[in-house]
Amino acid sequence: MSKKIPSALLLNDIHVSKDNIPEFQKNWDEALYICDQYGIEDMIIGGDLWLSRSSQTLSTLMAVRQAIIKATKAGISITVAEGNHCKVDQESVLGYSHLFSEYPHVYVVDDYSIINISNDVELYIMSYFPENGSFVERLKKMVKAELNASVHN
């Protein structure tokens, strides 16, 4: 019987806002606890870290900043893909999470990124782009350029 070992913690639709900072902090701490209990070193946010695409309050930005610092100090690398709630301009690669893209062990996905989960598994992560906009072409380009037939994708 094989033992299953978690490789990463995947999170989506966190939707942090000025109105739910305590809940965000509690959920983040729970995620860090899970990472600690299972020896997980990679946290991957697949989109919608933020609730509002129009603006972020300073308290919301600081809560996310503190959460990111707490995670990276615990030895956890964070990858963030921008969701539709994370971008003012839906076709731009830039979103609110790019404020933290230069932090150590924080990786913010521009269009797409590939994470090697194990020797035979690659996880493809794409930031949000509108379905009636550039999404389909970006996806086709990624598949054509990056799909690796020698591993599970």
Label every PLM stretch briefly.
Residues Y38, N119-N153:
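His/acidic metal-ligating clusters that form di-metal
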Residues S7-L9, E122:
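A fold-wide structural signal in alpha/beta-hydrolase
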Residues S2-S7, I14-I115:
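Core catalytic region of metal-dependent phosphoesterases/phosphodiesterases
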